[in-house]
Design a protein with these regions (language model features):
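Phosphate/pyrophosphate-binding loop motifs in nucleotide- or prenyl diphosphate-using proteins
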Residues: 1-129
């Protein structure tokens, strides 16, 4: 499959199955937002370095976002044909990760957390927005 059409886009793009939709279609907007998050998570993975305790979690989240994006880009009539599945129930996985991080944080927090501190922290704040 080529990544270009040589025909100009005329404000349209393809989704799974070859259907043409407007570039301002909610599915394209949603996937653009998910792709931005995925890119920031990738940047965080590079910044923290190999072997960091967050690597596995961030990689899981990136893979999961790609699966979600594939479903967003699949028309309802073709959803059953999409072979992409999440590796684990995302709510269970995320709750386990939240519990892990909550155990490391001293509660109750009485202050707002200002974005920044260091580059990784700042990128984590960008990801959450």
């Amino acid at each position: 499959m080529k990544i270009y059409t040589r025909g100009g886009d005329k404000g349209k793009t393809n989704i799974h199955g070859g259907q043409r939709v407007d570039k301002d279609d909610i599915r394209i907007e949603a996937n653009g937002t998910l792709d931005e998050l995925n890119s920031v998570l990738g940047l965080i993975r590079v910044l923290i370095g190999e072997g960091h305790e967050w690597q596995e979690m961030l990689f899981y989240l990136q893979r999961s976002l790609m699966v979600v994006m594939s479903h967003v880009a699949t028309p309802a009539a073709l959803r059953g044909q999409n072979p992409n599945r999440l590796p684990e129930e995302p709510d269970v996985y995320c709750e386990r990760q939240i519990d892990f991080f909550n155990a490391k944080i001293q509660y109750p927090s009485t202050h707002f957390i200002l974005p920044g501190g260091n580059l990784v922290s700042a990128q984590c704040h960008v990801a959450r927005t």
